[in-house]
A protein has these predicted regions:
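Short beta-strand/loop motif that positions the catalytic acidic residue
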Residues: 200, 206-208
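Conserved hydrolase catalytic core segment
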Residues: 84-122
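Conserved HGGG/HGGXW glycine-rich cap/lid loop of the alpha/beta-hydrolase fold
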Residues: 3-60
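Catalytic active-site module of serine/aspartate enzymes centered on a nucleophile-bearing elbow/loop
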Residues: 228-273
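Hydrophobic, aromatic-rich cap/lid helix
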Residues: 168-193
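Active-site loop/oxyanion-hole signature of alpha/beta-hydrolase fold enzymes
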Residues: 40, 49-87
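Helix-rich cap/lid subdomain of alpha/beta-hydrolase
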Residues: 116-169, 184-185
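Conserved alpha/beta-hydrolase "acid-adjacent" motif
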Residues: 213-219
Length: 273
């Protein structure tokens, strides 16, 4: 385990594996740096960096939370792991962080963003405000209820999957991450940030699962349309959850091509040609 220090002094824990240009993985809700296990094919071509987002695993946290602090955390890991702008693969809210950090000025060599969950009019709306309700459940010691609320009202997992939480040994690990669930809401809640995405100058690949709900498919299409030069790719046979083995060939192809494209990889902020 290694430690980077974010702009506010918070420690951010990260691991590295493999060899080659740096590829940082930014994960979504209920995930830690151990969630994404890099396949050998990816490790042969890239130095893969996984990190605990603030408040998770071995990383610290500092109140009050703002989305900018998540962007600062990614910047700190990037600075600690290389001298060149890194590639970033983001999944779910981790994809939103990568996109919004780039829009805020973080130099990146390329971004592959899988289903950043920016909502739209088609997104199912929970009866209660997610951030407020989860915060109340956590404050009153009802973390198990917070997990169930997220799974049922936000992730919309089937009832049979919810039933698996009862007595599951991994349920405690999910409960430990519930204080960070409102952070995921904060970075995505206002919908596709079209003005922010329009300012991105790094190569971007927007990814989605062909089996995902219609609102997800619409959201990623809107993200691609708002981002200059971005490419949209829908992956057959997958929904919001996609294993590393399935995404690896796509990441290798996109990031290899991005390395040959004039961009912020040279350390400037000029729009690629």
């Amino acid at each position: 385990m290694n430690i980077a220090r974010s702009a506010d002094g918070t420690k951010i824990a990260y691991d590295t594996t493999g060899d080659g240009p740096v590829l940082i993985v930014s994960v979504g809700a209920f995930c830690t740096r151990h969630t994404f296990v890099a396949p050998e094919e990816l490790r042969r071509r890239f130095t893969v960096v996984t990190y605990d987002r603030r408040g998770r695993g071995d990383s610290g946290d500092t109140a009050p939370f703002t989305p900018q602090r998540e962007y600062d955390d990614l910047a700190a890991v990037a600075a600690a792991t290389g001298t060149e702008p890194p590639f970033v693969f983001g999944h779910s809210s981790g994809a939103a962080i990568a996109l919004r950090a780039a829009a805020a000025g973080l130099p990146l060599a390329g971004i592959a963003a899988y289903e950043a969950p920016f909502p739209n009019e088609d997104t199912p709306q929970p009866a209660l405000d997610p951030a407020e309700h989860i915060g109340e459940l956590v404050r009153t010691g009802r973390r198990g209820e917070a997990v169930r609320f997220w799974m049922s009202e936000i992730a919309r997992v089937p009832a049979e999957m919810l039933a698996q939480l009862d007595g599951a040994p991994w349920a405690t690990a999910l409960e430990a991450l519930t204080p960070t669930l409102p952070y995921n809401v904060a970075v995505t809640a206002r919908g596709v940030p079209t003005a922010e995405l329009a300012s991105i100058t790094t190569p971007v690949l927007i990814l989605g699962g062909a089996n995902s709900p219609a609102w997800f498919r619409r959201s990623v299409a809107d993200q691609a349309a708002a981002t200059p030069g971005a490419r949209l790719q829908m992956i057959d046979g997958y929904d919001h959850n996609i294993p590393p083995e399935a995404i690896t060939p796509i990441l290798i192809g996109f990031f290899t091509a991005s390395a040959e494209t004039p961009s912020v990889r040279r350390g400037d902020r000029t729009r690629r040609r």
